[in-house]
């Protein structure tokens, strides 16, 4: 079973640095991540199967999330919690491998312990002077067990291919921020009422709904992108997406042309964090799937 989440802004396909309007104000995201836990699949005439110990770390630029192998014939609906259940939130990232959603992440998805995981992270810029251009940074990162928000079962119309069931949801990312004065909030990494409202908006504002956004035809390069996340300026993370499902080759060069890193057979969408430590400077990132190629200049600041 694969959960496919099409993230949206004002009904259009999600993109970082893309303007959207909420509360009558123009904003854009530079980072959007959140956890899903307590997932249950309703199937085959009303049976309910909880997906125990299955966690999703969703990101605005990633669509597909593998939930596991099950003997379902017909999936009827899906329910889940936004955030991490209390038992897991009392754990620690060191208890999981790096590829696990609850394992160490870059940028971090936790505040250490006992504080626990960030349930929802919304970073970006908002228009503070009403000129239509987002200029003031905001960063809401919600933590605390009280942030856990249960989403009622969502009826779905899954598709099947090669013994895989695809469950399609739309996540209206802008609705996470409904009713929040982002300029006044600024930076808030806590269990505050603002962060609680952001998490509760997942239910109250129906952030999640059944369906998908048909952004473009397969292999169309116009939907390919890479976004550099500078949350850690000394160790940027690369969020990327290619519309084709071909595997990706990644290369990093110095501005002098020296080849520093090569990584092959990466998935067509994801986040890449170089394990190598880089000195301050300018670097060139290259991503290619054999047909389409993206190059991006970025900086490291130690």
Regions found by a protein language model. Give the residues of each.
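Short strand-edge motifs at loop-to-beta-strand transitions and within beta-strands
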Residues: 63-65, 269-273
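A short, solvent-exposed, low-complexity linear motif enriched for acidic/polar residues
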Residues: 1-214
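C-terminal tail/sorting-segment detector
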Residues: 237-238, 259-262, 278-302
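Short proline/glycine-enriched turn/loop motifs at strand-loop junctions of beta-rich domains
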Residues: 34, 242-248
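Short beta-strand segments within Ig-like beta-sandwich modules, predominantly Fibronectin type-III
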Residues: 57, 263-268
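Structural beta-strand segments of beta-rich domains
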Residues: 1, 234-238
């Amino acid at each position: 079973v694969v959960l496919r989440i099409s993230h949206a802004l004002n009904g259009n396909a999600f993109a970082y640095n893309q303007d959207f309007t909420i509360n009558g104000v123009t904003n854009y995201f530079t980072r959007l991540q959140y956890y899903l836990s307590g997932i249950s699949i309703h199937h085959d005439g009303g049976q309910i199967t909880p997906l125990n110990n299955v966690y999703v770390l969703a990101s605005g630029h990633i669509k597909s999330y593998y939930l596991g192998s099950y003997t379902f014939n017909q999936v009827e609906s899906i329910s889940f919690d936004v955030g991490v259940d209390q038992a897991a939130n009392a754990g620690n990232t060191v208890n999981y491998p790096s590829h696990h959603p609850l394992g160490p992440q870059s940028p971090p998805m936790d505040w250490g312990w006992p504080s626990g995981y960030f349930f929802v992270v919304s970073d970006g810029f908002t228009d503070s002077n009403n000129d239509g251009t987002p200029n003031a940074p905001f960063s809401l990162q919600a933590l605390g067990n009280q942030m856990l928000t249960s989403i009622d079962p969502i009826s779905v119309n899954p598709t099947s291919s090669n013994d895989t069931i695809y469950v399609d949801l739309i996540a209206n990312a802008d609705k996470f921020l409904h009713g929040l004065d982002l300029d006044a909030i600024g930076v808030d990494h806590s269990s505050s009422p603002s962060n609680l409202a952001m998490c509760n908006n997942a239910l109250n504002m129906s952030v999640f709904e059944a369906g998908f956004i048909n952004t473009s035809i397969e292999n169309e390069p116009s939907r390919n992108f890479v976004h550099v996340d500078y949350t850690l300026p000394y160790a940027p993370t690369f969020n990327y997406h290619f519309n084709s499902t071909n595997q990706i080759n990644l290369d990093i060069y110095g501005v002098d042309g020296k080849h520093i890193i090569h990584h092959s057979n990466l998935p067509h969408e994801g986040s890449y964090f170089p394990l190598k430590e880089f000195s301050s400077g300018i670097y060139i990132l290259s991503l290619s799937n054999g047909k389409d190629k993206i190059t991006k200049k970025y900086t490291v600041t130690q």
